[in-house]
């Protein structure tokens, strides 16, 4: 195979094949430098081990082509260079004599003398030519050496050398008519590479004169070139493209020199035109300029076939072109072929001044469409509202020329408009804030996730106000609405207790989900009314949720100060009501309270409050037991309000699933209550008049525990003992609606209210499930050892008891 196959291109022409023996093509050193094709190989029967002839189609007589590298500063360094060398050279210490063949003179080419004239210019300008590239002859085998124009163009290799220039020259002379339009852009491609590569920019754009093959003097050729150049500048080729000379075989080194000259030389015109001393940036980068005259045919972006040199029939309108000097003073963006967006119209005006038809690129068309769409958008925005028109027109007025807005600018404008609309709406909201309709308040009570999501409950009202305005609320507005809601609920609560007492027998279902509980706690802490407002909130929600007879929409929102005054009055009333009853009644109240948290562990109502470690300053304990999936017992404990009230008397404040038991941290009442303990259990029974008869076994078991606990501690426990009691006592009041008969004084009405609320919390749920859940809860809290776990040491400090309680919850 290595002997019969084709020659390795890189081995024979560049001696650079690095594959060695693994190369599938033939490496035969005997054939190096030989240009004779093996006829046996052509017939497919060359079996010689060492064949001195080439197993490759030789399409050019390289021995008649001057070596390009001979005239370079480094000289030709190839040991087996097949090209013609006029002088001897040293390669790796070996002297190689000049070539023996004589270069034939070709009389047909009228340009060879011109090339000779360029030799002097080439000497100084061609220092740009860089390293001798190994790809210089990449196209050499494509064309035959005769002057017959080949039907196929040699493939364009970007850094290729001048070996294919002969073919280009043949095209330029004989196939000029068809080839010119195609190759007009080609020089630009190569011009862009001209700084770094030796590739010749393609072909002269001569139209008719090159058909005359008479031998002319140098002066005639130069004058003709200048005339052609003045005619054809601006035809879409660079300013030099008409001056580019097309080498034909020239005797001696002249052809070699001329070849290199063509790449960088620019000649100024004779007829008093401005000399183009330097190529413009467009020409050097190979970008296209607009075509002149009425020729709209060559597009700004050439097709792939044109760029690769395929022949395309061109319109004859190319011949008559008006000179275009306006391109000399183009802006940088225009010379780079990039039209700046704001100057689109200016650029088209310039083109029209010269009398040209401007062929738009795809980018320009897309930009125009985008600008039209944006213009439509702006007109729509103008029609929408006056605030929008101000913003959209201000941008248009600012610049006299039409300015295409970017996407980010449009977004910024929209945001600005929305903010203005928000400001206006917030002003309206602050001036006239009214309560929502009954149904919307029910939404906030029955569907608390709506309350939880920021300001969403406010939006239905906004939509009913005006469907045209889509309003996105700011954080400040949401906070304002929350504060207003807190005020509204607290105000409505002031009227609701009186309604509760007026209708003592009515049952109410209070539907509260998890998140409202958390929100209530947060809002209460923010309002600095931790104890009083939570019960007020519950009453308010009951009233708004279920009492349909009351028209809440007419209640106006009042200021926070008046609310606080009412709360203080209410607290004083409660103090009086708490101070009046006897100690025995107090004990019975506390026992009842201890039972009530058990009732709140209804499976349907779960509220998770964050556990806080007890601190003496706040003296709050939250017991959170989530052992049973649904029922969570939260005992909340606050002695703060007691210190406000001055007297250490207990106040009972019960919310469904959040119970606040307030008791005195003083030890003297504790001891007294221990003495009165027998009254405790006596007072419990009348309260649960309906359910005492049907005591479940769970109750008996739990009541057995109660005396044990109460022997060594009182029922009005300081700080932490009361929560434990509340965990133990059973749910006796889950269905009792009647007010307790034995509780005396104002506390009896209070107790009836609490009992009613508790019964409402558990109505609709079967009592057995409540008791079962409670049994499970007690069993889980105590870990199966009720008496052992719940026994408390009366001598322990309050903090020790609190720590024990938190440890028990954690375990």
From Swiss-Prot:
ZnF bounds (C3H1-type): 2-30, 32-58, 61-87
Modified residues (Phosphoserine): 109, 133, 150, 172, 291, 371
Keyword Nucleotidyltransferase: no
One GO term describing the cellular component: nuclear speck
Keywords: Coiled coil, Isopeptide bond, Metal-binding, mRNA transport, Nucleus, Phosphoprotein, Repeat, Transport, Ubl conjugation, Zinc, Zinc-finger
Keyword field contains Nucleotidyltransferase: no
GO BP terms: poly(A)+ mRNA export from nucleus
Localization, UniProt: Nucleus speckle
UniProt-recorded name of the protein: Zinc finger CCCH domain-containing protein 11A
Species of the source: Pongo abelii (Sumatran orangutan)
């Amino acid at each position: 195979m290595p002997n019969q196959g084709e020659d390795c291109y890189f081995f024979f022409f560049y001696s650079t094949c690095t594959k060695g023996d693994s190369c599938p093509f033939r490496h035969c050193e005997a054939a190096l430098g030989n240009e004779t094709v093996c006829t046996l190989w052509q017939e497919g029967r060359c079996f010689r081990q060492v064949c001195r002839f080439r197993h490759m189609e030789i399409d050019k007589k390289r021995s008649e082509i001057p070596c390009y590298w001979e005239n370079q500063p480094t000289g030709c360094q190839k040991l087996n260079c097949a090209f013609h060398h006029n002088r001897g050279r040293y390669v790796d210490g070996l002297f190689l004599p000049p070539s023996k063949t004589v270069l034939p003179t070709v009389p047909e080419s009228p340009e060879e003398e011109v090339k000779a004239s360029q030799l002097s210019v080439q000497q100084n300008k061609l220092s740009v030519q860089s390293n001798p590239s190994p790809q210089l002859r990449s196209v050499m085998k494509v064309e035959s050496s005769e002057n017959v124009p080949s039907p196929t163009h040699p493939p364009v290799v970007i850094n290729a050398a001048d070996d294919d220039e002969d073919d280009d020259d043949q095209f330029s002379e004989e196939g000029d008519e068809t080839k010119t339009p195609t190759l007009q852009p080609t020089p630009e491609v190569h011009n862009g590479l001209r700084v770094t590569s030796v590739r010749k920019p393609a072909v002269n754009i001569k139209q008719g004169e090159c058909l005359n093959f008479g031998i002319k003097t140098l002066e005639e050729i130069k004058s003709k070139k200048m005339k052609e150049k003045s005619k054809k500048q601006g035809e879409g080729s660079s300013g030099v493209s008409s001056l580019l000379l097309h080498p034909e075989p020239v005797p001696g080194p002249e052809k070699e020199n001329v070849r290199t000259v063509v790449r960088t030389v620019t000649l100024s015109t004779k007829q008093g035109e401005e000399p183009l001393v330097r190529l413009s940036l467009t020409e050097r980068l190979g970008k296209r300029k607009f075509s002149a005259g009425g020729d709209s045919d060559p597009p700004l972006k050439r097709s792939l076939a044109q760029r690769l040199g395929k022949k395309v029939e061109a319109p004859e309108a190319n011949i008559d072109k008006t000179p275009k000097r306006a391109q000399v003073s183009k802006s940088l963006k225009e010379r780079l072929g990039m039209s700046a967006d704001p100057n689109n119209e200016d650029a088209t005006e310039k083109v029209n001044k010269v009398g040209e038809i401007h062929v738009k690129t795809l980018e320009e068309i897309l930009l125009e469409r985008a600008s039209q769409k944006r213009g439509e958008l702006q007109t729509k925005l103008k029609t929408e509202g006056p605030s929008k028109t101000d913003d959209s027109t201000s941008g248009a007025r600012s610049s006299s020329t039409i300015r295409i807005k970017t996407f980010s600018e449009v977004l910024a404008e929209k945001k600005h408009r929305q903010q203005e609309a928000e400001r206006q709406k917030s002003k309206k909201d602050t001036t006239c804030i009214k309560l929502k309709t009954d149904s919307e308040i029910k939404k906030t009570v029955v569907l608390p996730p709506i309350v939880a999501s920021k300001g969403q409950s406010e939006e239905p009202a906004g939509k009913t106000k005006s469907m045209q305005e889509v309003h996105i609320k700011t954080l400040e507005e949401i906070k304002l609405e929350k504060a207003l809601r807190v005020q509204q609920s607290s105000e409505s609560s002031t009227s609701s207790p009186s309604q509760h007492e007026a209708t003592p027998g009515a049952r109410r279902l209070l539907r509260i989900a998890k998140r409202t509980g958390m929100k209530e706690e947060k809002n209460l802490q923010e309002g600095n009314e931790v104890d009083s407002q939570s019960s007020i909130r519950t009453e308010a929600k009951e009233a708004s949720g279920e009492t349909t007879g009351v028209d809440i929409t007419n209640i106006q929102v009042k200021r926070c100060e008046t609310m606080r005054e009412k709360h203080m009055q209410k607290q004083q009333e409660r103090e009086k009501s708490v101070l009046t009853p006897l100690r025995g009644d107090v004990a019975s109240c506390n026992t009842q309270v201890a039972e009530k948290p058990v009732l709140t562990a209804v499976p349907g109502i779960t509220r998770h409050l964050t556990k806080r470690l007890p601190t003496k300053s706040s003296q709050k304990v939250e017991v959170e037991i989530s052992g049973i999936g649904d029922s969570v017992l939260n005992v909340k404990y606050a002695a703060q309000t007691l210190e406000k009230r001055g007297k250490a008397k207990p106040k009972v404040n019960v919310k469904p699933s959040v119970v606040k038991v307030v008791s005195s941290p003083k030890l003297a009442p504790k001891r007294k209550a221990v003495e009165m303990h027998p009254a405790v259990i006596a007072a419990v029974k009348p309260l649960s008049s309906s359910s005492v008869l049907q005591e479940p076994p769970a109750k008996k078991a739990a009541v057995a525990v109660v005396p044990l606990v109460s022997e060594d501690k009182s029922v009005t426990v300081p700080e932490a003992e009361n929560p434990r009691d509340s965990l133990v006592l059973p749910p006796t009041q889950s269905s009792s609606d009647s007010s307790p008969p034995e509780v005396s004084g104002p506390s009896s009405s209070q107790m009836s209210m609490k009992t009613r609320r508790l019964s409402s919390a558990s109505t609709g749920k079967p009592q057995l499930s409540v008791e079962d859940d409670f049994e499970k809860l007690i069993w889980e809290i105590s870990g199966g050892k009720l008496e052992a776990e719940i026994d408390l040491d009366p001598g322990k400090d309050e903090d020790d008891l609190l720590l024990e309680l938190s440890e028990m919850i954690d375990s």
